[in-house]
């Protein structure tokens, strides 16, 4: 024990000494007690001090021993001094640390007081130590919370394996100075430590991967977390022990708080090198890669695509133009170009290029381009997700084209209106069509119409369009879209909707949306569109919905629609006819009214009007678009338009309409000056055209005058002349409140776009117009009629927009059909003119119920004018547009424009429209139909819509039209519109009220004809004769043309002539909503029995609709087998229409199907339209809606893509596909692009498959002949039955082109080709059961066409499947692998044939072929394969189908398979 010499600082020793002394002192001494207490406290504090002092990183080595009091105090003094020095240094902005070896911690940056909290803040981050070599010598356990790595995974690993490549340098810079600086620390003093903060990106362990080392190579696909590291470097000189810790970097890493995160530059850039020819030789995206912004690869890809793609209307792409400038100037900046990313984000890009010359020869060597990109997050399109919403909101106005429509359809007009509304129309339309369909469908008809078209059109790079000039791009790219200004984004938005915004593609809903925005914002700029949308919305909210869509849609539509296709052109006329505002608002509707002049509507309306048919129309369309744009920006024209619209509106409907029209126009344009001006121009053009039509109907001189007026005077003249009529019309509307309400509903339904909100106003306008039509007979009357048509869209529109077609058709039908259709109107009028007038009057009367056509001459003139312009544009439009991917538009056109041809037949104008709408409807049958109906006197859309909503109410307004619409719509949309048909029935009675029973008959006839025609068209001879050949030759142009004019007129006439009676019979069925099935059956029988029906169908565009829906309808048309067989060949293409028609007809057929024949099999459509009749194929029904949507989308795409003969066949399948696809919910999500691409593939395959079909069908026939019966095992692949029946739908869904069970059934019928298949395979047999016999019958009925028949069989199934050719084919093939197996060759052949029958069918065929091949049933081997090969486990087992189902991809292989066949 030591003496006094002992270190008293040593607590243990002091205590020992005390204890020794204690015995000497027996009693506790207060002094000693105090001393002891003090020493204890001293020791306690010294210990605490030691803990504090040695808690620093620098003293980490000192933890090995316990320092004595003296050392502790000494260290404390040092640290206090250091702290003071640090404070001084901080004041002097010196970032030096204490100079003492045992300096506290790198507190140069972090105070001692802050160190503890910072260390605790490790809760916010993790702690790690890195040595000089970059190895992680220690890492805290909570690293898992940040990087997902476990502590063990990172220990002794290289820190660079988790650091972003771009941060390695920064990290090394922080590591080396501390570790390598032998004295050269940040301050340059060897013994000092430096602490600093830097940011770096650390790899987050991929969920699947457990090792971080493999991530470097995956960097592009890895996720990095931005971390803020507080690092303290420890120089070697400080290290006394623990070599491992020498020269190490001690870091605390925490996530960078959002507020502290550096705002990433909104601009990004990448560089490319091009040779002197402009070809890209290298691409450097390192800067974008380092920025780690999401989607940069897509950004680069789309930027290059946009920059190097030659755009419509431009001779050179941006890249070529820019390259020329660079070569010429050495340095050049490109213009700013825009495009959309897959997520809908708008990007503005500019390219700066420099010509690099050789330093020696000074010769140009290459061009280096810097592409600067700026993401415009807040522009029209937010994200693909927001695109539907953001865009949808702007579109809302556009969609506002049918706010009511949106309300009906979409519920939330703003967001997905285009998508929701459009997609809803197609998707929901089919089922909702029954109740709301009209509103949504009819009202949104244009939208829907557009939807269907757009569904197909979205193929175009809508997103790009949106960026550029949505109005132009959208219309040009998406003709259908242009037409459906209201639902530009529609599917899109299947999407658009699909994915409404379906990110990537132009086809994506997003694309659609973009496009729609563009369309709506005729200015061709999303912002304009947005403004227009807002204005339109405002106007709509104010009740000025009329011009809204119009202005938005119209300018674009005008320019774009005209350009897009007859449909596009027609829609503006319809709008015009429907109402100045409506037409403007709803380019689609407005155009049909101007149908005659619709083509010229934009700016070439007069010209179009005069020579609207043919090339003039497309040219006019483009011209209109150009002019339209200039006019759009022509405030003067806009003012005139406003005046005209206002005057017209005021006169037509002083209170709401005037403001509605003008306001709507303004709103819809966003502002008269801006989009408004475009809209105004469009309206002005439409008004001019309307007046021209009105006056033109009187005489060419009047037309010229009108044209002149339209150019300058028309504003006032038209205003004045139309004003009276308009006023009258408006007055009449008020006169009949019920009518007004009906009109409102009808108008809303009919005029989705513009009439959504302004519908009531417009409808009143229509009514009043009708009412005043009598007073203001003559030019005013005509004008009023036109206006009324514009306003009402149904009767008036049809007469106006379809006046030409109507006139022609009336001429054709007057002898046979018109008298029957309109016996009371002009039963005794032998002259076509009289008949036409009578029909027009009828239509007008139907619309105005109370005012029978007072001025026959005026009406006649109007009809004539419209028809003439309509007819002319129609053929030209159809022909021109069809070639231009306007098949869908064509269909749409036919719907609207077709309203002319169709209405003449159907309603003498209204009815005609219905089939076409049906066609369109199948394209966008349900939605389109309403549109068509609206366009064409709202036959389908309007009548349908009205019947759906206020069938009775509307009936008075335009009973005939409504009824016709209803009937037609019913026919078209039977399944979906069971209610609609019933409404039509109601409409018919109403019609009967307003007009004699004959009208009812007419409606009934029309209805019957509509459905029958649609179906008959699909299957009827008329369909086959005209549709088939034209379709085959010129898929839609010819089909449409025949449908449009002569074909339609003559055929319709016959069908009407014969079918009126038959139709009259069905009419009662139609009258009884519950008897829709019977009515359909009757209609079908009636239509089926008349060759004239074929013509009617054609005139109505039913053949095309049938083509579209033929595959699906084939079964339905078992009764029509012969015609179907014939049709299926042609209808294969016509079936695009067919499928559209079938969309409507699907519902229609379901009613008919059960009674008609194997139409029961038609459940495909039934499924589509079966909603009203769950009985047929509820499953299919649900899917049908998506199918309809898809059908519309696909139909458009296919129509555009299948404008050629291929297109006709493809159309059939395509439309069927569309129909089926819309029916399949899964379909809806499919990108428009995918559809478009598929359709393209199908088109390509279709040509091959068409040939293949014939070959395959022949083979199939041969195989059948050979008895290529699939053994039960073949058919048996139980998977088949299951897959076919249930999977049918699921399969369809699974297939992405989920075809309704009908598809499976349809496909089953294909198997039906092989007689054995049906009985052998439960799936096959049930499926075959429906489809097979009809199909087989049809196929057998037409041995020559047998391949097509088979195709038809397939077309029915395959068509059903066709809709989802790829999908269907797989389900078909997957499940039907058996089918393929059982009918191996047959299936392939049938499949092929069917596919040939329809676009999808083609694909299916191809798919089946490939499927068959996949199923190891080579096409060639299929026959030989027979039951035996079918017995192959692969083939026989459900596996075959399962495999094939998965093999849906095989469908993709279809092309190859079909190629093989080819």
From Swiss-Prot:
Query: Where can this protein be found?
Result: Nucleus
Which residues in this protein are found as Omega-N-methylarginine? 1259
The segment(s) forming the PAS domain are: 119-183
- Extent of motif LXXLL motif 2: 690-694
Composition skew (Basic and acidic residues), residue ranges: 624-636
Phosphoserine: modified positions: 29, 487, 493, 499, 554, 565, 682, 699, 736, 771
Placement of covalent cross-link Glycyl lysine isopeptide (Lys-Gly) (interchain with G-Cter in SUMO2): 239, 648, 705, 731, 785, 1452
Quaternary structure and partners: Present in a complex containing NCOA3, IKKA, IKKB, IKBKG and CREBBP. Present in a complex containing CARM1 and EP300/P300. Interacts (via C-terminus) with CREBBP. Interacts (via LXXLL 1, 2 and 3 motifs) with RORA (via AF-2 motif). Interacts (via LXXLL 1, 2 and 3 motifs) with RORC (via AF-2 motif). Interacts with APEX1. Interacts with BMAL1. Interacts with CARM1. Interacts with CASP8AP2. Interacts with CLOCK. Interacts with DDX5. Interacts with ESR1. Interacts with HIF1A. Interacts with NCOA1. Interacts with NR4A1/Nur77. Interacts with NR4A3; potentiates the activity of the NR4A3.
Entry domain remark? Contains four Leu-Xaa-Xaa-Leu-Leu (LXXLL) motifs. The LXXLL motifs are essential for the association with nuclear receptors and are, at least in part, functionally redundant. The LLXXLXXXL motif is involved in transcriptional coactivation and CREBBP/CBP binding.
> Which protein are we looking at?
Nuclear receptor coactivator 2
Q: Which organism is it from?
A: Mus musculus (Mouse)
Provide the gene name from the record: Ncoa2
């Amino acid at each position: 024990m030591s003496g006094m010499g002992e270190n008293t600082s040593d607590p243990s020793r002091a205590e020992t000494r005390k204890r020794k002394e204690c015995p000497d002192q027996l009693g506790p001494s207060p002094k000693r007690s105090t001393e002891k207490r003090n020493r204890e406290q001293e020791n306690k504090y010294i210990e605490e001090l030691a803990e504090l002092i040695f808690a620093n990183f620098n003293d980490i080595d000192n933890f090995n021993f316990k320092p004595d009091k003296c050392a502790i105090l000494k260290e404390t003094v040092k640290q206090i001094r250091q702290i003071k020095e640090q404070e001084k240094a901080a004041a002097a902005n010196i970032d030096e640390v204490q100079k003492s070896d045992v300096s506290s911690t790198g507190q140069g940056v972090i105070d001692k007081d802050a160190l503890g909290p910072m260390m605790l803040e490790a809760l916010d981050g993790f702690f790690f130590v890195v040595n000089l070599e970059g190895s992680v010598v220690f890492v805290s356990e909570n690293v898992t919370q940040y990087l997902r790595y476990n502590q063990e995974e990172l220990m002794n690993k290289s820190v660079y394996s988790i650091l972003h490549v771009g941060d390695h340098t920064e990290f090394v810079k922080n590591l080396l100075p501390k570790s390598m600086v032998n004295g050269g620390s940040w301050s340059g003093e060897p013994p000092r430590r430096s602490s600093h903060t830097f940011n770096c990106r650390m790899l987050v362990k991929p969920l699947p991967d457990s090792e971080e080392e493999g991530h470097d190579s995956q960097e592009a696909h890895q996720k990095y977390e931005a971390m803020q590291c507080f690092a303290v470097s420890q120089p070697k000189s400080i290290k006394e022990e623990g070599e491992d810790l020498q020269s190490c970097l001690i870091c605390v890493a925490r996530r960078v708080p959002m507020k502290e995160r550096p705002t990433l530059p909104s601009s990004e850039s990448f560089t490319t090198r091009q040779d002197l020819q402009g070809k890209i030789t290298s691409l450097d995206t390192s800067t974008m890669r380092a920025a780690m912004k999401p989607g940069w690869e897509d950004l680069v890809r789309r930027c290059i695509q946009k920059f190097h793609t030659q755009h419509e209307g431009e001779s050179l792409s941006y890249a070529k133009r820019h390259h020329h400038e660079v070569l010429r100037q050495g340095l050049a900046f490109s213009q700013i170009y825009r495009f959309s990313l897959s997520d809908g984000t708008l990007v503005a890009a500019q390219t700066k290029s420099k010509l690099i010359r050789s330093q020696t020869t000074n010769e140009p060597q290459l061009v280096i381009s810097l592409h600067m990109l700026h993401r415009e997050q807040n522009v029209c399109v937010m994200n693909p997700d927001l695109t539907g919403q953001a865009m949808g909101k702007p579109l809302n106005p556009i969609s506002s084209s049918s706010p009511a429509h949106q309300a009906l359809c979409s519920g939330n007009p703003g967001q997905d209106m285009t998508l929701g509304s459009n997609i809803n129309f197609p998707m929901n339309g089919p089922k909702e069509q029954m109740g709301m369909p009209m509103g949504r469908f009819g009202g949104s008809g244009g939208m829907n119409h557009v939807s269907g078209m757009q569904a197909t059109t979205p193929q175009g790079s809508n997103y790009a369009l949106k960026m550029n000039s949505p109005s132009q791009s959208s219309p040009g790219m998406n003709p259908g879209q242009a037409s459906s200004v209201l639902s530009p984004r529609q599917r899109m938005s299947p999407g658009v909707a699909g994915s409404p915004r379906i990110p990537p593609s132009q086809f994506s809903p997003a694309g659609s949306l973009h496009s729609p925005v563009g369309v709506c914002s005729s200015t061709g700029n999303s912002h304009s569109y947005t403004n227009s949308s807002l204005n339109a919305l405002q106007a709509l909210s104010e009740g000025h919905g009329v011009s809204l869509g119009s202005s938005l849609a119209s300018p674009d539509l005008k320019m774009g629609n005209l350009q897009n296709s007859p449909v596009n052109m027609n829609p503006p006329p319809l709008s015009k006819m429907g109402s100045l505002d409506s037409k403007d608002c709803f380019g689609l509707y407005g155009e049909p009214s101007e149908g005659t002049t619709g083509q010229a509507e934009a700016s070439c309306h007069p010209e179009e009007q005069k020579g609207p048919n043919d090339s003039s129309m497309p040219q006019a369309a483009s011209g209109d678009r150009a002019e339209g744009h200039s006019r759009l920006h022509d405030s003067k024209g806009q003012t005139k338009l406003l005046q005209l619209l206002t005057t017209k509106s005021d006169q037509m409907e002083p209170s709401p309409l005037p403001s509605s029209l003008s306001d709507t126009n303004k709103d819809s344009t966003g502002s008269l000056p801006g989009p408004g001006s475009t809209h105004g121009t469009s309206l002005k053009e439409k008004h001019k055209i309307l007046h021209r039509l009105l006056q033109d109907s009187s005489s060419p001189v009047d037309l010229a005058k009108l044209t002149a007026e339209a150019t300058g005077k028309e504003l006032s003249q038209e205003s004045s002349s139309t004003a009276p009529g308009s006023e009258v019309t408006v007055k009449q509307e008020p006169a009949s409140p019920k009518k007004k309400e009906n009109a409102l509903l009808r108008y809303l339904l009919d005029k989705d776009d513009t009439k959504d909100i302004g519908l009531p106003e417009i409808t009143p306008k229509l009514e009043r117009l009708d009412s005043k039509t009598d007073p203001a007979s003559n030019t005013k009357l005509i004008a009023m009629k036109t206006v009324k048509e514009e306003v009402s869209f149904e009767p008036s529109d049809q007469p106006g927009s379809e006046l030409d077609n109507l006139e022609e058709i009336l001429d054709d039908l007057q002898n046979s059909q018109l008298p029957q259709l309109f016996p009371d109107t002009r039963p005794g009028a032998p002259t076509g003119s009289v008949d036409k007038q009578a029909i027009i009057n009828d239509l007008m009367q139907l619309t105005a119920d109370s005012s029978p056509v007072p001025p026959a001459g005026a009406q006649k003139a109007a009809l004539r004018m419209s028809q003439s312009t309509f007819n002319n544009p129609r053929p030209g439009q159809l022909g021109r547009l069809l070639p231009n991917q306007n098949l869908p538009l064509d269909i749409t056109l036919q719907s609207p424009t077709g309203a002319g041809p169709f209405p003449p037949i159907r309603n003498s104008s209204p009815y005609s429209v219905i089939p076409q709408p049906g066609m369109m409807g199948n394209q966008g049958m349900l939605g389109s139909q309403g549109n068509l109906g609206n366009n064409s006197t709202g036959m389908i859309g309007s009548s349908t819509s009205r019947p759906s909503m206020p069938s009775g109410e509307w009936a008075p307004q335009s009973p005939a039209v409504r009824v016709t619409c209803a009937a037609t719509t019913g026919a078209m949309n039977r399944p979906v519109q069971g209610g609609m048909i019933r409404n039509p029935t109601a409409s018919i009675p109403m019609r009967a009220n307003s007009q004699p029973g004959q009208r009812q008959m007419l409606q009934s006839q029309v209805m019957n004809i509509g459905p029958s025609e649609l179906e008959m068209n699909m299957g009827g001879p008329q369909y086959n004769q005209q549709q088939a050949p034209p379709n085959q030759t010129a898929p839609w142009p010819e089909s449409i043309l025949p449908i449009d004019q002569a074909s339609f007129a003559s055929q319709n006439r016959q069908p009407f002539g014969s079918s009126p009676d038959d139709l009259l019979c069905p009419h009662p069925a139609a009258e009884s909503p519950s008897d829709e099935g019977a009515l359909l059956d009757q209609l079908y029988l009636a239509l089926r029995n008349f060759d004239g029906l074929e013509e009617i169908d054609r005139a109505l565009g039913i053949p095309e609709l049938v083509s579209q829906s033929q595959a699906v309808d084939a079964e339905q048309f078992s009764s029509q087998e012969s015609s179907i067989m014939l049709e299926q060949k042609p209808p294969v293409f016509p079936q695009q229409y067919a499928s559209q028609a079938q969309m409507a007809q699907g519902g229609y057929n379901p009613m008919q199907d059960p009674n008609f024949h194997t139409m029961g099999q038609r459940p495909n459509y039934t499924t589509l339209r079966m909603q009203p009749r769950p009985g047929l194929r509820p499953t299919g029904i649900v899917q049908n809606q998506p199918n309809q949507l898809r059908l519309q989308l696909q139909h458009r795409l296919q129509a555009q893509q299948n404008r050629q003969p291929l297109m006709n066949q493809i159309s059939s399948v395509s439309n069927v596909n569309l129909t089926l696809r819309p029916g399949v919910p899964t379909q809806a999500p499919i990108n428009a692009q995918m559809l478009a691409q598929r359709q393209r593939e199908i088109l390509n395959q279709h040509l091959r498959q068409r040939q293949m079909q014939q070959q395959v069908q022949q083979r199939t026939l041969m195989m059948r002949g050979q008895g290529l019966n699939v053994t039960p095992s073949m058919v048996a692949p139980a998977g088949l039955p299951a897959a076919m029946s249930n999977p049918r739908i699921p399969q369809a869904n699974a297939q992405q082109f989920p075809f309704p069970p009908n598809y499976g059934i349809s496909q089953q019928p294909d198997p039906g080709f092989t007689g054995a298949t049906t009985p052998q395979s439960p799936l096959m047999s049930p499926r075959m059961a429906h489809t097979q016999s009809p199909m087989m019958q049809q196929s057998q009925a037409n041995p020559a066409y047998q391949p097509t028949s088979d195709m038809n069989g397939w077309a029915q199934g395959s068509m059903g499947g066709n809709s989802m050719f790829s999908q269907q084919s797989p389900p078909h093939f997957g499940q039907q692998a058996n089918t393929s197996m059982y009918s191996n060759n047959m299936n392939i052949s049938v499949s092929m044939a069917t596919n040939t029958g329809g676009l999808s069918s083609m694909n299916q065929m191809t798919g089946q072929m490939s499927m068959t091949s996949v199923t190891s049933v080579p096409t060639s081997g299929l026959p030989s394969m027979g039951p035996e090969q079918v017995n192959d486990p692969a083939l026989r087992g459900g596996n075959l189908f399962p495999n094939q189902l998965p093999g849906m991809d095989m469908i993709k292989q279809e092309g190859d398979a079909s190629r093989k066949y080819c």
